[in-house]
From Swiss-Prot:
Organism: Vibrio campbellii (strain ATCC BAA-1116)
Annotated function: Involved in the biogenesis of TorA. Acts on TorA before the insertion of the molybdenum cofactor and, as a result, probably favors a conformation of the apoenzyme that is competent for acquiring the cofactor.
GO biological process: protein complex oligomerization; protein folding
Subcellular location: Cytoplasm
Protein's UniProt name: Chaperone protein TorD
Recorded name of the encoding gene: torD
PANTHER family associated with the record: CHAPERONE PROTEIN TORD (PTHR34227:SF11), CHAPERONE PROTEIN YCDY (PTHR34227)
SUPFAM superfamilies: TorD-like
Length: 215
């Protein structure tokens, strides 16, 4: 159990890291940390897994190119804005409703389902984010909390049930629309930083599901 709990902490941290990248633009200081030994070592560690390596390599390449990009922070913030804050026609809006909702509008059934799931879990959307519950950053943050909450369990049977629920969440609330979202990122993200993050997220979700299913 202790090994599982230690691994859960790492999994939660990774989902929270992804969440932070889709929640808001990176500041100058945050961007600097992406060139630090700590973050590069973290990415290298992820890249040691064969299924993650191609996506990690693409992300590292984007980070290396950022170092040569003039006004890198401003340009990356502009990329974030164009992709995630503008229109569905020219961007990749990070809401499940835009991809699997019936209306093609915000706050469709996926947002309602997430709100209920969060309420059942005793959570609500962070007021600072001011986004619907099916925003990608909210869903990833929630998954991180699900994982950490399961570390309070003491019986192996209960932990197995919790891991099954985590896999269900990944399959039903993320993998149902992440591939379409990543495809739109690829279409509109010319520089390629955010599409590389989206592709790495998908690769990680698939890997995590394999782990959760005990394959």
């Amino acid at each position: 159990m202790q090994e599982v709990k230690a691994f859960n902490e790492k999994r939660a941290e990774i989902y929270w890291w992804f969440s932070s990248l889709f929640a808001k633009e990176l500041t100058e200081n945050e961007l600097e940390t992406y060139h630090s030994v700590e973050i590069r070592s973290f990415l290298a560690g992820l890249g040691e897994n064969e299924s993650l390596k191609p996506a990690v390599d693409t992300l590292v390449d984007a980070l290396n190119r950022l170092q040569d990009r003039e006004d890198a922070q401003l340009e990356l913030a502009a990329d974030f804005c164009e992709l995630f804050l503008k229109t569905e026609k020219h961007g990749a809006l990070p809401y499940a409703s835009m991809y699997i909702g019936k209306s093609g509008l915000l706050n469709d059934k996926p947002a309602e389902e997430m709100e209920k799931l969060m309420a059942d879990f005793g959570m609500q959307v962070d007021e600072n984010l001011k986004e619907p519950a099916d925003h990608l950053a909210v869903e990833l943050d929630f998954l991180g909390n699900m994982i950490i909450r399961s570390n309070e369990l003491e019986q192996e049977k209960h932990m197995e049930e919790a891991l099954e629920k985590q896999n269900e969440f990944i399959q039903q609330h993320l993998m149902t629309w992440l591939p379409q979202f990543a495809a739109k990122c690829k279409q509109f993200d010319e520089f390629g930083f955010y599409v590389s993050v989206a592709q790495l997220l998908i690769a990680f979700c698939k890997l995590d599901s394999t782990y959760l299913l005990g394959e």
